[in-house]
Amino acid sequence: MNCCRTLRELEIQVGEKVFKNIKTVMKAFKLIDVNKTGLVRPQELRRVLETFCLKLRDEEYEKFSKHYNIHNDTAVDYNVFLKNLSINNDLNLRYCMGNQEVSLENQQARNSKKERLLGSASSEDIWRNYSLDDIERNFCLELSKSYEKIEKALSAGDPCKGGYVSFNYLKIVLDTFIYQIPRRIFIQLMKRFGLKATTKINWKQFLTSFHEPQGLQVSNKGPLTKRNSINSRSESRKENIITKLFRCTEDRSASLKKALLIINTKPDGPITREEFRYILNCVAIKLSDSEFKELMQILDPGDTGVVNTSMFIDLIEENCRMRKTSPCTDAKTPFLLAWDSVEEIVHDTIARNLQAFYNMLRSYDLGDTGLIGRNNFKKIMHVFCPFLTNAHFIKLCSKIQDIGSGRILYKKLLACIGIDGPPTVSPVLVPKDQLLSEHLQKDEQQQPDLSERTKPTEDKTTLTKKMTTEEVIEKFRKYIQQQDPAFKKRFLDFSKEPNGKINVHDFRKILEDTGMPMDDDQYALLTTKIGFEKEGMSYLDFAAGFEDPPMRGLETTPPQPPTPSKSYVNSHLITAEECLKLFPRRLKESFRDPYSAFFKTDVDRDGIINMHDLHRLLLHLLLNLKDDEFERFLGLLGLRLSVTLNFREFQNLCEKRPWRTDEAPQRLIRPKQKVADSELACEQAHQYLVTKAKNRWSDLSKNFLETDNEGNGILRRRDIKNALYGFDIPLTPREFEKLWARYNTEGKGHITYQEFLQKLGINYSPAVHQPCAEDYFNFMGHFTKPQQLQEEMKELQQSTEKAMAARDKLMDLHQDISKAFTKIDKSKTNYISICKMQKVLEECGCSLTEGELTHLLNSWGVSRHENAINYLDFLRAVENSKSTGAQPKEKEESMPISFATLNPQEVVRKIQEVVESSQLALSTAFSALDKEDTGFVKATEFGQVLKDFCYKLMDNQYHYFLRKLRIHLTPYINWKYFLQNFSCFLEEVRISAAHKHLFENELKLVFTKWIID
């Protein structure tokens, strides 16, 4: 259409379209007019006209609406609008319009005549006389009659064309075009079609899956649930029954063969006519009596009453091969079979395999609740009833589904079959994988003949073979190792509690109830072998005898059963009491001690674990509990979901130690007490050192490298750290500093073996506590490993290079890191923890270990407060490092020398430059400390003064400097001699490169004057 239509043309076209579909248009208006006011919004009026009549351009609709006094801000009386439209077009609407009240009454009267089920939505008494199946059948019939109208109405309620409408809107549409249903019944009805009241409805998918358009004419003749089923009587009699059967089973041959094998696992075995007809009705086609009789004349010409399955399967395979060579061009039609026939074959199949079916159900319901998840139930049904389609499965679940939880009441299904309780022989639960493999591999077993198969199930279960002692012991071991709940429950039915004892008579009854009957001689031998005493045996005593491989009292050890599959162990749920019993043992098997378990569980390294961390630890130990059982487990431990544990509390749980009066639970003090928890980690590391020093001093001393001039061993910070890491006891830098301060109380930087052992509470023995026997080299009376200085120099150089690379990367990512910090700081405190800072840097592309990050922060002078960092200071430090590196060379001399980025070779030279340029200031600072003017200050005070003048001098650089001067073990340093002769030392360092053998002797002479014994 290239030009706009005139007003007259619009009136004629709209009028013709409206009055051809006047009933549908009126229903659409009333659908929108929920409150029955007779008014709709102008936008809704236009949407109805464009949906049911014709599309209008904006200028056309503006012209049309102006003529009928329709304004954007005023509601429209659609009855008046239709009357005016009819008057302008000289049409008579009396047959469908008239008074609005009369129209509503007539509409209700017509709705009441539609079906006997129709009535007032508010009155549920009428609906109670009909089952949900009856309602569904009539509902489907009415929907098929109004399919196109419902489709248009749902499309009108989807202006965005997204394909979704609300559940309430769907109900309004269906109530308008079909009949009004009480909301409670409507929700139940929609659940049958897979719709939920809490989610948006994909109305296109609903209509497509619920009712195909090409089946409208068929569905008008009968209920929709059978609209796709094959009515054999409607087929031509001239068509051969075999040809028809093959046509219907073309895409279902695999399911048909599997169903036949489930009924008869022997491929060439016979099958009764009734069984064969059930399978055909479910999987392929529902045959009439005459058609089935015609088929039997071909498959059973001798009228023996049985069908040879191998012959029929061969016919199917031959038909498939022929169709592959000459494909059929006819369109395939999916078949939805009658539910009555499907339900009958399902019940019959379950009854034939009752024991295996019940065992598999119980393997998913260890607590015997009678409930099973929908997905698990579907897996089981596909094993036993592979012919079950999704539509049939939904139909089955709708009858036995628990409305509250959505789970399946499988005991209700068993009751429908006529089984009120468990099978005659109590099931012996085995892993689900084993059940599946056993059932799917039935063709490997010998199948009894037809006469024996047709006997009642009860006759088979009563004939039970007597078991030997070895077989029973084998089963016992399997029960205990797999934690079989059925056997344990039966045992506790007699003993009442795990510690309660049962007598010999009750024990034999347990064996018989669990499918292990024995004769008197074998039973007497069994009680002797398992150590059954006169006073009886408890379940705990019984289980303990089978947990360890060498069972007590056994003359011959039976072969070990196969270890249960990992999938079974992971899915095996246990009770809170079982978890309480297994937790300490599993912890010892998986971890060396409680500290290792706590360290692995405490992922954020804050010294605190919550109940989520504890639950994750249980899963790691293969202790799987449901959520409610986990809460019960916490209750047995005296805990709640909201509490936290420090290491001491966790250790008490693992080792079941009584609380001491000085060990108040940390959660009673405050939720997070990180300082106390770091001390607990230090205490654990200290206990490790105590144990090693007492029992394995030779292993511990391998990490101690130095002795003093008298041959006594000395320890430094890195020696203790290397020892802890060698024993797999890593500590955070903050925790290690606390531990080192515990030993280095005088701040000398080193301690002797005597001092170290005294801190450990061990008496020093010169004969035992000796340094590790290695070659040492003498430097000024101190024996140090020759490689030590080289290793430390290399380590210091590597750390400096890493720090420079990290600084460059942080400069490049400065903006991204700043945004990430701002986003994570929701409380706007400007502080974040070290762990979170690590995580943010890693996400931004700069991965640093805690040690590297700590080194970087210390080099930039960024302080920490309770293991938290002010990220604004951190960002400022990054900016300053960036600006410092970008300054021109002529300004570098005016800036203080930063030692953070210097390599080890430059440290001594730079300190010498600082000393030369700041002689007077250094002398003043040392004099302030040396108030008595002795010329000596403590080594710690000496280091602090140097750090004040040497910008960002690191601890490892300072200690390297002291060892380079050979004064790292001196408690007091002559600062006056240092200021006067330090430049001479630097000159001798240069000479030593060419005259190393002379330098050592000269070095002794130069620095002997520094040291006062």
From Swiss-Prot:
InterPro entries, A to Z: EF-hand-dom_pair, EF_Hand_1_Ca_BS, EF_hand_dom, EFCB6
Region (Disordered): 441-460
GO annotation terms (biological process): flagellated sperm motility
The EF-hand domain, residue ranges: 20-55, 145-180, 251-286, 287-322, 352-387, 482-517, 589-624, 695-730, 731-766, 812-847, 917-952
A GO term, aspect molecular function: calcium ion binding
Organism domain of life: Eukaryota
Location(s) in or outside the cell: Nucleus; Cytoplasm, Cytoskeleton, Flagellum axoneme
Binding residues annotated for Ca(2+), in chain numbering: 602, 604, 606, 613
Primary localization: nucleus
Known role: Negatively regulates the androgen receptor by recruiting histone deacetylase complex, and protein DJ-1 antagonizes this inhibition by abrogation of this complex. Microtubule inner protein (MIP) part of the dynein-decorated doublet microtubules (DMTs) in cilia axoneme, which is required for motile cilia beating.
Full protein name: EF-hand calcium-binding domain-containing protein 6
Species the sequence originates in: Pongo abelii
The encoding gene: EFCAB6
